[in-house]
Every structure is written in C-alpha cells, then in structure tokens.
C-alpha cells in the first residue's frame, strides 16, 4: 500500500498542476489563490487518509476476531462488525467534516456577496470531489487487480499445483491473499465510496447556486450537507440493533439496512423545511424548475430506497442461501463450461432490476427538480453509507480472521 500511495501521490501532484493550468489560471485576474487545486489536494489527501485508517482498523480487528471466535462466535461477530462501523463512521464523518471546513475557509477568504460569487465558491470546492475520485480510481481498480491476482495466484499455486487446502500455512501466497482483501475491499472500496459521496455533494451544492431563492435563504444551500449528517445520525441509532444475539448473521446485517433506511426516511422530513417555502427554483437549460419541498423529499427518498432495493437484489443473487447460487452450484456438476455459462447469465440477469431502479430514480428526480433532483437522489442513495461501509468492512475483516484461523490450525 505504501508503494501504491507513493505512485498515487506523484500522479496527484502532476494532476494538480493540470487543474491549476486548466481551471485556476482563468480566474487569476480575480483570485490570486489556486482554490480549485487546493481543494483537489485536500480531497485526494482525505481519501488516502480514509484508506489508511481502514487498513489499520482491519489489521487490528482481524486477529481479535479470530481469538474471540475461538471462544464465542457472537463476540467475534461483534468485533468484526464494530471494526466495520469505525471504518464507516470515520470515512463519512471525515468526508463531511473536511468538506464543511473547506467551505467555511473559502467563504471567509472570498466573502461572496452575490449569486455569481457564491457559484464561484462552490465551483472551487468541487475540486474536493475530483480529488477523491482520482484516488478512488487507483484504489478501486488498482487494489481490485491486486486482490484478484493474489487470490487466484494463491489458489493456483496451492490448491491446483500443490494440492493443499485453501489458507494453508504451507502456502506463502495465503498472506498475499489476505493482504489483497484489505487493499481492494477496505482501502479501495472506502476510496470509491468517498469519491461518490464527495462528488454527489459537491454537485448538489453547485446546482443549488442557480437558484436565487436558495441563495437568499442561505441555509438552503447547505441542505445536501444536512441530508448527509442525518444519514450519519440514523446509522448511529441503527447500530444498536446489531448486537441482538443470534446465529443468523445475514439477517442481522439486512435488518441494519432496513432500519437505517426507514429511520432516515422519517428523519429527513423536518430538514426539508430549510428549503424555501416558495420552491427551490432551479435553473436548467433556460427553464426554471420550481420544485417544492416535498418534491425534493421525494427525490431523496427515491434514491434512498433504490439503494436498498439494489443491495437486496445483489444479496439475493449472491447469497448461498438463495436459489440462483444453488442452481449455479448444480450446474458445476456437469463441468467448467456450464459453470461459466450459467454464472455469466446469472450476472447479466442480476443487473436488470438495478438498472430499472436507477433509470426510474433519475427520470422521476429530473422531472421533479431537474439536475438538483438527480443530485439529491444520488445523496439519498448514499444516505446510509456508514451502515453500508460497516457491512462492507465486516466482510474482509471476518475473511482475514478465517484465514488466520486456518493458518493457525485452530478448531472449526
């Protein structure tokens, strides 16, 4: 990971120069400071910090999970899930905190007095999202390639060539496999979702500056940040439902998603009264979309519940408890070719409902509030991100714990 971040740091430095020349230079007659480039560097640095924090959390929690599972499986589950929770709340909390500090700093430096200057302020801040996405590209794609290369390489060397079990201490590739889980599924996934959150929030902030009503009602511009903060609060309340002692881990994790979605749906209602009473009045392509408070609420809810549906559909097609994977396992009895054909067909089929969910969400949101509605829907889809990250972090931590147990020859 040190090598990855070194290469990434060099790339970000070069890209920052491009941002300076392409974006900040035209503003030099008005603003002497490279605001967009600075926001880009802050976004990239925050994303890398989130990835590092995730790696530290995963490596601290995995061996503790192994030890506690040897005593009581429920205690091991608690440690693994709490590790995921720390990762989730750190990432979303840092993303929101640094973005708010950046906005306040730029506001104090620029002192915007009219709509045009406010628009410039948030255009400068948009570099924050670009920085997060740049790191996400390396973390998700580069980390994912390393993860799969280490996984397949360890399996080929161990199970195929040497005929030894998976995660056997006799196979040195096992260590690379476990490290790969952290690099791709912790650091890479965290950077990816950080970039998505930063981009969608910055997009909503920029679009909101096209509304004179929202600029006059100053608090209304920060409505996207309020929605993200409500998501953190809803996820914090929801985490207490995870520690009901049960052997049904999958059910417990699904309850987390359901409860956080329902809570956030209710908690957003008081927040919509921050928006102008007469409507947001978003300008797009020469037309004004005067969406009401409740229409903005519908946009957020569409994104929120679409995200839940997509997660549940993904779980249905990939869980070993459900029909699709069982049918795929039966196809494996007839050879590798039926396995590949059925697996590919199953992957295609699993995308149908998510595509329709996304299409309907974008279409309805755009009809209600133009691009502002689409941005709010994206923020809504990421509303329960702390819980989603908790569940995503739980996977690699528990997987690493299983690998450590196998290498240590612990009892099942």
What are these regions (language model features)?
Residues 1-412:
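Hydrophobic packing and interface segments
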